[in-house]
């Protein structure tokens, strides 16, 4: 989990840092768990841009990840820790006792040769997956389901973890990485530990080309666009934006404007919003 710096023999190397990938044990993924991944370039099924600044980048295959962890009671041995170009976390190839191979999100401390389990009888050990009702209060967890059996949706990014704070009847109370406190049904599963690659947030990309390799395109300021492209556009030279406050490209207030729906179905599950004291 170390970070490598470079001698500034070129301008782009002066700030650039990279992960050492010392936890990675192989560069050859399991072929049976790969599927082709077509480039979307931020377009939807109609060909319209729904996510700006996306396109290009290196070719990649999608790794099929087991987010459900429903193979209960069968031990699985960790065969390798691998890099996944589709996410910030590392992944672990596990081989079950019956011969089946699956990828899981690798937590911090998981090594080749370790044995992981899932189910109500699994030990409270890094990498094991259990329902929240079987996990002790205070445990650090990741890969959390929002609906039982749907698969993990929360706490999957590199270095992230949630904490099980309490249990009340049919619900568990979790503190998420954002600081949000919310209810989750106790039948939902979670994995023990913190997600791997904890130094990902201090990596400095360092140069534009590296960002392009990751599939990101340049971001252009609205004030240098035409008025039909952005509310800040138009005018002669370096003109003011012409509005009392900054706006998004779609005319909504920018910088701190709340975009969450007032009557979202999950409002009743949130005890404390992120950022609140």
From Swiss-Prot:
> What is the superkingdom listed in this entry's lineage?
Bacteria
GO MF, one annotated term: structural constituent of ribosome
Under the heading Pfam families, the entry gives: Ribosomal_L2, Ribosomal_L2_C
Keyword annotations for this protein? Ribonucleoprotein, Ribosomal protein, RNA-binding, rRNA-binding
PROSITE patterns for this protein = RIBOSOMAL_L2
What SMART domains has UniProt attached to this entry? Ribosomal_L2, Ribosomal_L2_C
Q: Name one GO cellular component term.
A: large ribosomal subunit
Coiled-coil annotation: which residues? Answer: none
- Signal peptide boundaries: none
Region Disordered: start-end pairs = 218-277
Which segments cross the bilayer?
none
Gene Ontology terms describing biological process = cytoplasmic translation
Q: Which InterPro entries match?
A: NA-bd_OB-fold (IPR012340), Rib_uL2_dom2 (IPR014722), Ribosomal_uL2 (IPR002171), Ribosomal_uL2_bac/org-type (IPR005880), Ribosomal_uL2_C (IPR022669), Ribosomal_uL2_CS (IPR022671), Ribosomal_uL2_dom3 (IPR014726), Ribosomal_uL2_RNA-bd_dom (IPR022666)
Described purpose of this protein according to its UniProt entry? One of the primary rRNA binding proteins. Required for association of the 30S and 50S subunits to form the 70S ribosome, for tRNA binding and peptide bond formation. It has been suggested to have peptidyltransferase activity; this is somewhat controversial. Makes several contacts with the 16S rRNA in the 70S ribosome.
NCBIfam families, per the entry: rplB_bact
Q: How does it assemble?
A: Part of the 50S ribosomal subunit. Forms a bridge to the 30S subunit in the 70S ribosome.
Family, similarity comment: Belongs to the universal ribosomal protein uL2 family.
The name this protein goes by in its record? Large ribosomal subunit protein uL2
Q: Which organism is it from?
A: Clostridium novyi (strain NT)
């Amino acid at each position: 989990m170390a970070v490598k710096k470079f001698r500034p023999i070129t301008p782009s190397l002066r700030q650039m840092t990279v992960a050492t990938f010392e936890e990675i044990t192989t560069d050859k993924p399991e072929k049976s768990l790969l599927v082709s991944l077509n480039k979307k370039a931020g377009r939807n099924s109609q060909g319209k841009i729904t996510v700006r600044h996306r396109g290009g980048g290196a070719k990649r295959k999608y790794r099929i990840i087991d987010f459900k962890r429903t193979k209960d009671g069968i031990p699985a041995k960790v065969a390798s820790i691998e890099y996944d170009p589709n996410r910030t976390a590392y992944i672990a190839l596990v081989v079950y006792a019956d011969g089946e191979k699956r990828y899981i999100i690798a937590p911090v401390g998981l090594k080749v040769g370790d044995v992981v389990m899932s189910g109500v009888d699994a030990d409270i050990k890094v990498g094991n997956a259990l329902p929240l009702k079987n996990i002790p209060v205070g445990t650090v967890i990741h890969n959390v389901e929002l609906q039982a059996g749907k698969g993990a949706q929360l706490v999957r990014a590199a270095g992230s973890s949630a904490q099980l704070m309490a249990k009340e009847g049919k619900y568990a109370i979790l503190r998420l990485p954002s600081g949000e406190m919310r209810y989750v049904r106790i039948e939902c599963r979670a994995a023990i530990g913190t997600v791997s690659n904890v130094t990902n947030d201090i990596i400095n990309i360092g140069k534009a080309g590296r960002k392009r390799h990751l599939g990101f395109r340049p971001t252009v300021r609205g004030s240098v666009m035409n008025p039909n492209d952005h509310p800040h556009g138009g005018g002669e030279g370096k003109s003011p934006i012409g509005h009392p406050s900054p706006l998004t490209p779609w005319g909504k207030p920018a910088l701190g404007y709340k975009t969450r729906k007032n009557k979202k179905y999950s409002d009743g599950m949130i005890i404390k919003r992120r950022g609140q004291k």
